[in-house]
């Protein structure tokens, strides 16, 4: 896909993912971003590395990396920006999702 993907992965996110893949010494890894039920607001975000792309996965390429999103999660993530931030409170992946009507204090769960 092009850089005009409906899900945006920032350069900071890509740099951290590239570092993590290098640490694992496995260039076949792809970052899977997903949404599932749970958390204090109804849905929660998740991240995991995966070597396998399922037939129905959406594949987004940026900066030489591959990101995977399953169809159910994709509908909740369209328009979202996925970033990586570092601050005094710690380092984390952050999803800025315009589809989320409410989010919990930690930012890892949301409702629509």
From Swiss-Prot:
Keywords for this protein: Iron, Iron-sulfur, Metal-binding
SS bond list: none
Molecular function GO labels: 2 iron, 2 sulfur cluster binding; 4 iron, 4 sulfur cluster binding; iron ion binding
Names of required cofactors: iron-sulfur cluster
Protein name, UniProt field: Putative iron-sulfur cluster insertion protein ErpA
A Gene Ontology biological process term: iron-sulfur cluster assembly
UniProt xrefs under PROSITE patterns: HESB
Record's cofactor remark: Binds 1 iron-sulfur cluster per subunit.
A Pfam family: Fe-S_biosyn
Natural source organism: Neisseria gonorrhoeae (strain ATCC 700825 / FA 1090)
Record: residues binding iron-sulfur cluster: 40, 104, 106
InterPro entries, alphabetized: FeS_biogenesis, FeS_cluster_insertion, FeS_cluster_insertion_CS, FeS_cluster_insertion_RrpA, HesB-like_dom_sf
